[in-house]
């Protein structure tokens, strides 16, 4: 099927000046139309705010400098996943438009459009019918919404662009055997691997294409030039698997499958993706997680049916190689996510729409070519409506994508929609609870955390978040119970040790608080918040020198840490052990006050105490009165009462001392 004499684009366009000009105008018009339709299909996501792990993928504050850019490349673990080129692009985007979400979304959409346009060129060079239809389906198919509308999946759209660029250059090398296009293809492949290593399957995909074109493979012509691609892809894949396991966390009970069970997963995954590609309804951000067991007989039906399909296609390949080639491309490109390798999202579900971003091309191309051939043959039931079939199909897919991309408007909508479509998604309940917790809707948050624990009682995250909600609600004892249960599941959970330290600090159990803060530092030695809180506890215990040292360590880690700066100023201003440092206390308090715009009554309270320690009682009284008035305006009654006491001392030219001093 499709076995025709090869001709490149230049040969085709030189067949006649009128035809070349007409072809050129038609291509530009179709390109513009494809971009416009794709932009409109993703319109609801244009201003979508960051969701789920976007904050972990977007450039962290500590990586936004040139030094941070260097760490992106040289320090695995500095970013959530080691994809340095993708994170470099995030870094550049942050320099250009900061936290403006539309910039990130529009770039991903345009990268996706560029890939679709490159796909047209590739299919034309391979002389596969329906190139524009295949590109349009790829561009607006709703299965791609997760890759395009989710900021983090710039990894997919960027690596996809390099994937297509590499294939296009390699096809030119295959025709000319010149070194230049080969070098370009290899360079694009390397760039793609540094964006997302899922494209490591590219050399196998190229061999499938060559087998489809020629009916056989030659070691010297076809395989040998791809050896560097295989070596680089394998090395990148092994490294990524190590990162997923050791740095991202793709290990533990959720990943304990036998080899037989992994084959069962693979068979089911392939049919699942094929089904969603053909019938793209009820797409979910987190699909139900299957219970896979090698003792359940019906789970063997999936790999068995796949094997039978391949046998049929192999027999048909004696006359028509295209169907087998398309299915093999689909399966091979899916290989990294078929279950044989551990990837972190498997913790929540064994399937995800963005996993088949590139693999979908195997089926899309078959469908588009089939439609194009039917139109060309002019069958009686096709002729009356001609290309309206194609227009209707693309329009329908674009509408579905428009609806699907609306799910990515904001994080709350994402989790609510996920729960509506998959009520048993414990992760969605947990994450929606986190959103509600941040909004101060504690009762609603607690409901979702408890629902998450009903579904998955052994997950430490939901248990820890329930503890945090209870702590904010004032139920300190029950919060401590939940935190301890979380630690039973995950003993080295640094965040929970930190939260437990805070809970014990509220209860006045200072030794317990110190123990948990120190446990946190074992896992997170550069956590400025922990050093600050340790300083608070030590100061309450009268260990002023130790407290000051911990505040200074917090500021060393994060010089913009206002609270640590204020706490250090308070320790210096209210301790009789530090009279010679009163000027330092004033300077620190002034800096903290400037950083908060002079609108924080607690910071002004510290500045007043620093002035008093320095003997500047008139400034202390003036600043104390400003602080008192702000506290009254902000309904901070306890702070206002404390300030009345302190002002009474300043009026007598007496500096304030904390009770334990």
Where are these regions (language model features)?
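Conserved alpha-helical positions within TPR/SEL1-like repeat arrays
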Residues: 426-437, 461-472, 495-506, 529-540, ...
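Polytopic membrane enzymes that build or remodel cell-surface glycoconjugates and lipids
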Residues: 2-468, 495, 533
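Structural marker of alpha-solenoid helical repeat scaffolds
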Residues: 421, 455, 489, 523, ...
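Terminal, low-structured helical/coil segments at or just beyond the last alpha-helical repeat
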Residues: 578-583, 591-594, 598-601, 613-617, ...
